[in-house]
Amino acid sequence: MPSDPGPEAGSGWPGLLMSCLKGPHVILKMEAMKIVHPEKFPELPAAPCFPPAPRPTPTLAPKRAWPSDTEIIVNQACGGDMPALEGAPHTPPLPRRPRKGSSELGFPRVAPEDEVIVNQYVIRPGPSASAASSAAAGEPLECPTCGHSYNVTQRRPRVLSCLHSVCEQCLQILYESCPKYKFISCPTCRRETVLFTDYGLAALAVNTSILSRLPPEALTAPSGGQWGAEPEGSCYQTFRQYCGAACTCHVRNPLSACSIM
């Protein structure tokens, strides 16, 4: 006969009591969750993200084609007529450098205010009689080139740009010596007088101050005609550069009757 087995583990009253106390087995399903620390990811906002507040758009001033009355353009402001701005510091203007005179620049001659330059000669206003006589007294009555005395027919004195006078016959020879460049070299100072017009030597003024001091016999035409004993000295031959085709004077008329001269 088999022997009676002893009480099994968990069996008997103690095991029954323990099984009653344990109750039914409950299975709970746990989900895995990962905890992220914010200091490892600074781009993740810790607080709830809200859109930024809209900023007011600045209003742009309309462009002006012309500056206003109170606006100063430095490069265009000149003189002492600039309006003073309120609150702007006033700085004294820089001292201007004195301009060099004509003598310092190599031009010793200072033209007077009432001097008028007409073509190649200078016309000065008529001074008093004493001043005019003293100024004209220093001018010679003879041509510096040929040495002949001036007269009103063939040897009228004409003024060059250097204010020296030469008779018309000598000027004709000097003018024909360089017809290409149309300039005359003064026989006294060697300065050149350029003729810019088509009138030739007629563009040079007659020195009336010398004519007023000539003797009476130099103011009349010779007895043998306008040219005296010089048959080759006709109006067209000698003074063709002055009159040209428009000359209206003839052999018996004085040269002053020419409409161009």
Swiss-Prot record:
One GO MF term: ubiquitin protein ligase activity
InterPro entries named in the record: RING_finger_E3_ubiq-ligases, RNF208_RING-HC, Znf_RING, Znf_RING/FYVE/PHD, Znf_RING_CS
Official protein name in the record: RING finger protein 208
Keyword Metal-binding part of the UniProt annotation: yes
UniProt modified residues of type Phosphoserine: S102
Zinc fingers (RING-type) by residue: 143-190
Superkingdom in the source lineage: Eukaryota
Gene Ontology terms describing biological process: protein autoubiquitination; protein ubiquitination
Keywords assigned: Metal-binding, Phosphoprotein, Zinc, Zinc-finger
PROSITE patterns tied to this protein: ZF_RING_1, ZF_RING_2
GO cellular component: cytosol; nucleoplasm
